[in-house]
A protein has these predicted regions:
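Conserved N-terminal diphosphate/IPP-binding helix and adjacent helical/loop segment
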Residues: 1-76, 80, 84-99, 135, ...
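Hydrophobic faces of stable alpha-helices that mediate helix-helix packing
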Residues: 13, 17, 27, 74, ...
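Alpha-helix N-cap and coil->helix boundary residues
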Residues: 15, 29, 92, 108, ...
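All-alpha helical catalytic cores of prenyl diphosphate-utilizing isoprenoid enzymes
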Residues: 21-24, 40-43, 108, 122-218, ...
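Alpha-helical phosphate/pyrophosphate-handling elements in metalloenzyme active cores
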Residues: 31-70, 158-201, 237-242, 286-320
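Divalent-cation-assisted or electrostatically stabilized phosphate/pyrophosphate-binding catalytic cores
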Residues: 91-113, 155-169, 192-196, 218-243, ...
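Conserved ATP-binding module of the ATP-grasp superfamily
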Residues: 117
Length: 320
């Protein structure tokens, strides 16, 4: 589905992969640890958004690729550190870096790729891009702290949840689209439209991701179902289910167990899926996607705009 969706920039994505692998291979002792993560692929959602946004204007080709690689390295660095914090053993169906090389080397590898991503983006020579990515990394860190400090907080508000995912996920997606617009030399109104598109589609993406943690399968996700729940991360489906009288008492009793057993986790997933919480969470994701699509009215018809419109459907319909 992803290959078909991104066919408008298919050749660019092939070139992106070539440059990405070449860049990692040049990293000496860090290369072996990173290559298996890079070659595992993933959706390449963020660099694809960079290239799609850039294609709406007249970008310098090398700058667009450096921007896309910089974003992907920074995103990968956040995953390396997230997996450490969450004690995750797999990512995209393969062993995580800290399980492969150890905790201390994994911390250094994550730090290195934060710096490498920033270095690639600085090579573009555009101060607004440098400012955007530094602000974004700080925002992601704040989002991660919010997630850590709200673990097992089953009474957090919708506003608190939205603030958390805005920082942890939507901020980087917003930056992908904003920086893509900058290298595309778009005017201020269209740059702002793409920035708003990125934020809104990032919100939709994360809510859909939180739904998939309850409704997908381990094979589809590349990680165990209910992984967030097992780590104490309270997401929208559980928050909404806890407001339903038909399942709330049973859910409250289960999440009060310390520690929760595997059977407890499985029963929470079952109850959440049996409630209307999934439907309501999906409706929220859809609402953000609709608002994102509206931002594209600022652009004339083109293959890239058409793809960005279809991304709005993809983020809420995907299974992994």
């Amino acid at each position: 589905m992803v290959d078909e969706l991104l066919s408008a920039i298919g050749p660019d994505l092939v070139e992106f992969e070539r440059r990405l692998e070449e860049s990692v291979a040049a990293d000496g002792p860090l290369a072996d640890a990173m290559e298996h993560i890079v070659r595992a692929g993933g959706k390449r959602f963020r660099p694809a958004l960079v290239l799609l946004a850039a294609a709406l204007g007249t970008p310098d080709r090398d700058q667009a690729f450096n921007l896309a690689m910089g974003i992907e390295f920074i995103h990968t660095a956040t995953l390396v550190h997230d997996d450490l914090i969450d004690h995750a053993s797999t990512r995209r169906g393969i062993t995580t870096i800290h399980e492969t090389v150890g905790v201390n080397p994994a911390i250094i590898i994550g730090d290195y790729y934060f710096a490498k991503g920033a270095n690639l983006m600085a090579s573009i020579g555009e101060p607004s891009i440098d400012l955007a990515i530094s602000n974004t990394v700080m925002t992601i860190c704040l989002g991660e702290l919010l997630q850590l400090t709200s673990r097992r907080d089953y009474d957090q508000s919708l506003e608190e949840y939205h603030n958390k995912i805005a920082r942890k996920t939507a901020a980087l997606v917003e930056t992908c689209c904003y920086c893509g617009a900058v290298v595309a030399n778009l005017d201020a109104p269209r740059t702002e439209a793409l920035r708003q598109y990125g934020f809104l589609i990032g919100m939709a993406f994360q809510i859909a991701d939180d739904v998939l943690d309850y409704t997908s399968t381990a094979a589809e996700l590349g990680k165990p179902v209910g992984a967030d729940l097992r780590q104490g991360t309270v997401t929208l489906p559980l928050m909404l289910a806890l407001q339903e009288p038909s399942v709330a008492p049973a859910l409250r009793a289960l999440v009060a167990h310390e520690p929760m057993t595997d059977a407890d986790h499985e029963e929470v997933v079952r109850l959440v899926c049996a409630s209307s919480a999934i439907e309501h969470a999906e409706a929220q994701a859809h609402d953000f996607a609709v608002r994102a699509r509206a931002q594209l009215a600022a652009f004339d018809d083109s293959p890239s705009r058409d793809t960005l419109e279809r991304v709005c459907d993809y983020v809420v319909e995907r299974r992994s």
